[in-house]
Design a protein with these regions (language model features):
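Metal-cofactor-binding active-site regions of metalloenzymes
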Residues: 1-192, 201-215
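Active-site glycine-centered loops adjacent to acidic/histidine catalytic or metal-binding residues
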Residues: 197
């Protein structure tokens, strides 16, 4: 069994669905909260780890957004990305397509540039250090309104040559894909590829909308 595990670890791999903010390890969350003097509702790494025993999407999103609050600087986003790429490299990863949620950060007052410049720096360093290539996919938060997603797409314009596509994530109930038809059309017009989460919590109609309206 150990030989099989070693063999599998050594195989070249591509990770095509990774939410970078969701890769924040408990140790990193605790360290970043101290570094940036950001309060979190946990007293130890062990408490954070225990909070990851979620039973539904919303429970996961609650701790996901709590963790995102500790990300304050370009250095934080760079370190977050590098830590992920180090783990990916150790598992034989050669390529990754990374989702990031700029509205998670701009909605709490960070400039758009902080997150994307930090992530791009981490991606560049990971390629130089580990030979791991990567692409960036910008997600819109479906619990926010269409105006917020259109504003985010506008803010992303200086970096469109570094963004491979757009996605749609966060709380699904009550937020059908059709809510974002205009922003996805605008993204396509800018040459961005399209993807979207659908059907995790919502009805089958949401899957149809993602395929028929957002495509």
């Amino acid at each position: 069994m150990a030989d099989l595990a070693t063999f599998i670890r050594g195989l070249p791999k591509a990770e095509l669905h990774l939410h970078i903010e969701g890769s924040l390890e408990p140790e990193q969350m605790f360290a970043f909260s101290r570094r940036n003097k950001v309060a979190i509702p946990f007293g130890s790494v062990e408490e954070i780890r225990g909070a990851y025993a979620f039973s539904n999407l919303q429970d996961f999103l609650d701790i996901y957004y709590q963790g995102a609050n500790v990300l304050q600087t370009e250095e934080d986003f760079r370190d977050l990305a590098l830590a992920y790429f180090e783990r990916l490299h150790a598992d034989g990863g050669r390529h990754a397509e990374i989702f990031f949620d700029p509205e998670t950060h701009t909605d709490r007052g960070l400039p758009f540039s902080i997150a994307i410049e930090g992530l791009l720096a981490g991606m560049k360093e990971a390629e130089a250090r580990y030979g791991v290539t990567s692409k960036l996919i910008m997600c819109f938060l479906r619990h926010l309104d269409e105006a917020s997603s259109l504003k985010t797409l506008k803010a992303a314009e200086p970096w469109l040559d570094r963004i491979a596509g757009v996605g749609l994530d966060s709380s699904e109930k009550g937020h059908p894909p059709s809510k974002f038809a205009r922003v996805f059309q605008a993204a396509r017009e800018r040459g961005l590829k399209i993807c979207a989460h659908a059907g995790e919590e919502g009805p089958p109609a949401y899957v149809h909308e993602a395929l028929d309206i957002l495509r």
